[in-house]
UniProtKB/Swiss-Prot annotation:
Present with 12300 molecules/cell in log phase SD medium. Transmembrane segments: none annotated. It comes from Saccharomyces cerevisiae (strain ATCC 204508 / S288c) (Baker's yeast). It comes from the Eukaryota. GO terms for cellular component: cell periphery; extracellular region; fungal-type cell wall; fungal-type vacuole. Glycans are attached at N236, N417. Disruption phenotype: Leads to a slight sensitivity to the cell wall damaging agent calcofluor white. Also shows a slightly decreased ability to grow at 39 degrees Celsius. Results in an increased resistance to Quantazyme, a recombinant beta-1,3-glucanase that hydrolyzes beta-1,3-glucan. The conserved ExDxxE motif might be important for catalytic activity. InterPro entries: YJL171C/Tos1_C (IPR018805), YJL171C/Tos1_N (IPR018807). Residues 158-221 are annotated as: Disordered. Belongs to the PGA52 family. This is Probable circularly permuted 1,3-beta-glucanase TOS1. Residues 1-23 form the signal peptide. Residues 172-189 have a biased composition (Polar residues).
Amino acid sequence: MLQKLSMTALVGLFSSVVSLVNADCTYSGGNYYCAQTDAIIYSNVGLSATYQDVTNMDESSCACTQADFTASGSLAPFNEELSVHFRGPIELLQFGVYYPNGESNALKKRSEKQSIESCKEGEAVVSRHKHQHKRDVAVEYVQVTSTVYVDSNGQTVTADSTNTVVGPAVPSSYTKDSTVLSSSAQAVETSESQSSISSSKTTSSAAAASSSSSSSSNTNGDWSRGSYFVPGSTSNCTFMNNQGGTAGSGVWSSCFGNSISFAASDGVSGAASAQALGDVTIKSGNEFMIFSGEECSGNNGDCGYYREGIPAYHGFGGADKIFVFEFSMPSDTSGSAYNQDMPAIWLLNAKIPRTLQYGDASCSCWKTGCGEMDLFEILTAGSDKLISHIHDGQDGGTQDYFERPTDGTLKAAVIFNSSDKTIHIIEVDESFDATLSDDVVDQWLSKSGSSAALP
């Protein structure tokens, strides 16, 4: 049913469209794109609220139960443990996580006068056009009907028949998004068939700040590297995918499909034990994820509830942390995958993949706001524009974009700064050594860029 819009809402929507036009933004593939950037700064990140935490997944009834989880803190819910997710086509050359040694001065030195550039210098551009999300994947359910034996490298030694059922894409709850590019924004949410105007979303989400699942090493330096990966070698990183029940780790059921599992070195197959990702390029539509190297203590223990039978590991926790990446996203136009030539890197509340990343929304805390942060995402096939967006109770992002590294690589740092409630996504040139000096981090924090001010 069509709803009558107030004059205020109409004026606000008209102003948003005019701002986008004035900023020389372009409309392509259902999304607006404004200016290329080398830094995005999220501000006012964090809220105190409640989301629905999964407390049980019943294999007999195929039903999940949830309970209120109420918490707060600077950057919530992103001060909770996070898992790091990748979708092809992508080649990951480096990944790391840093934590401060004691109290980091760099997180306190940010000037309130930092210059923020938007689509047009000196002007705030407010956009309410829908961020077209492309996270859903066609899920292949693989039911294991006999034992599969693997060696220490995850290679199959003997294998009997399996029954593979390929069905339609399992719908996730990624159906509505709002995009914010200024502190004065009010949300306009759109669905596939209609648009409606509203004030900032009130979907509850929050999380308690959790300590790092991997302690900082006791070395000289202001930030210590707690996790690190280069192809074929990894420290305190566990690579996983959604091939549970196919190769000796994780589970499959007719209720919930494949769980997470250890990933083989190709990133695509399952494995019986943890392996480092090899020197590979992951093709379109395939996904893998990284957890820390620390196992959960047990179900309903230090990781909360998780699906029975999975390899359960901690994510990367703490309100102050730095993720670093070096990656390439080459073109991949030869296939017909659901997300063909649409690479992405994003963060999830680690509770989500430990229960159900894709499928019944009641089996995940995602819909109720426990947190997703898209760091670098292509929204339309073949695009060279990587956007960023936050999905939680605040929902926001920017129409500015990073250039996709189809040739060569992109090095980036993502800094979580609890002292002023900001998250910085920044292109960098520095090497990712065992320690980062406070001066380097301060330089990163001082870098101006595109504003993504949350309501």
